[in-house]
Amino acid sequence: MSERGEAPAAAASAGAGGEMPAKKQKLSSDENSNPGDLSGDENDDAVSIESGTNTERPDTPTNTPNAPGRKSWGKGKWKSKKCKYSFKCVNSLKEDHGQPLFGVQFNWHSKEGDPLVFATVGSNRVTLYECHSQGEIRLLQSYVDADADENFYTCAWTYDSNTSHPLLAVAGSRGIIRIINPITMQCIKHYVGHGNAINELKFHPRDPNLLLSVSKDHALRLWNIQTDTLVAIFGGVEGHRDEVLSADYDLLGEKIMSCGMDHSLKLWRINSKRMINAIKESYEYNPNKTNRPFISQKIHFPDFSTRDIHRNYVDCVRWLGDLILSKSCENAIVCWKPGKMEDDIDKIKPSESNVTILGRFDYSQCDIWYMRFSMDFWQKMLALGNQVGKLYVWDLEIEDPHKAKCTTLTHPKCVAAIRQTSFSRDSSILIAVCDDASIWRWDRLR
């Protein structure tokens, strides 16, 4: 799956093995990345641009006449007006492997006053950086997988519930989840279970030990990293029929929405009596006190499913309150909810066939797959990069969804596909990572 574009991914090798040594990099001050990497002229060109009229796009489910059971909300067009958020490009650097960087995540678990740390993943490399004032990006640590064929696609931060140490989970083409402790600079655990590549990792918003992974093997898995147990597998009879590309917990961690190459989005409840008991039992399980293996739950039936939102691979999904934001390779992020507008999402039945589309965030030149959007911690901003290096930032603090405001961020030297973006917890910094192994830092102007 090295080529993540319009063509379906090639088969990836799976299997365990290989230690993952840490490489502590010490850079001299002149080697450190600093704002001097961008000349004054380039800095002048790195600006926030007000978006004009939205680019029209090909027919998709979001702008064709309503399909049966689909309700449209208003005109369904999110017009771009001047966004109140402005950013300036203050730094960029390029990792030496030259391969696409597929993932980036700031550590949102740090305390106030702690350095702003983010991780990038690409090739067989995991790299940690620290953001300093005046635009500096300082290299902290770099980890290399022993297998040169590993290609990391995704990462997620959590913390050790006993020591409060930050922990970073990473996974990719080989289907192995690795847990890295940056304090001890070691890969402390690894999990093998998925039969193929892992496309996304997510930690539960209220339980730092519950890790969700989604895979090319058509399934989602929920792990307890404190007791090293596989709590549940979501998939099978009514599960995804192709690669699962993305998933997200809702704010309370009671529901999961997943999406994939089968064009579908599926809702899985983890606050059912069955799942609550399974999670409780995963904490009580001690392999030293029993010979029996932990029994993982097999969840074959989602609590809601639809294919009425997109007509192509659905490669990113996020909860926004009780609403869903999802995108495909169709130049639009769609805002929608299961059922009718007045329906309570917690009472939606698996047989429900209605969906309500509230609107769209339109953009252009983003019709390859595995391009993921992000929101800031408070869900006030939404950011997405396209395949020619443009960044779109929308203001989500709006009453009328049809008046979404957008800023386009461009730099003359940022021309490669932006695979993922990440905001610092205080929303002061936006990092974008690209197909040419470049990292771009945009600082918010107050």
Curated annotation (Swiss-Prot):
Protein name: Polycomb protein EED
Keyword Repressor listed: yes
Gene3D superfamilies (UniProt xref): YVTN repeat-like/Quinoprotein amine dehydrogenase (2.130.10.10)
Keyword Cell cycle in record: no
Localisation: Nucleus
Region described as Disordered: spans on this chain: 1-77
Main location: nucleus
Sorted UniProt keywords: Chromatin regulator, Nucleus, Repeat, Repressor, Transcription, Transcription regulation, WD repeat
Xref: InterPro entries: PcG_WD-repeat, WD40/YVTN_repeat-like_dom_sf, WD40_repeat_CS, WD40_repeat_dom_sf, WD40_rpt
Record GO biological process: heterochromatin formation; negative regulation of transcription by RNA polymerase II
Ranges of Polar residues composition bias in the record: 50-66
Domain of life: Eukaryota
Organism encoding this protein: Gallus gallus
General function of this protein: Polycomb group (PcG) protein. Component of the PRC2/EED-EZH2 complex, which methylates 'Lys-9' and 'Lys-27' of histone H3, leading to transcriptional repression of the affected target gene.
Subunit annotation: Component of the PRC2/EED-EZH2 complex.
Ranges: WD repeats: 96-139, 147-190, 193-233, 239-280, 309-346, 364-404, 413-446
Cellular component terms per the entry's GO annotation: ESC/E(Z) complex
The family this protein is said to belong to: Belongs to the WD repeat ESC family.
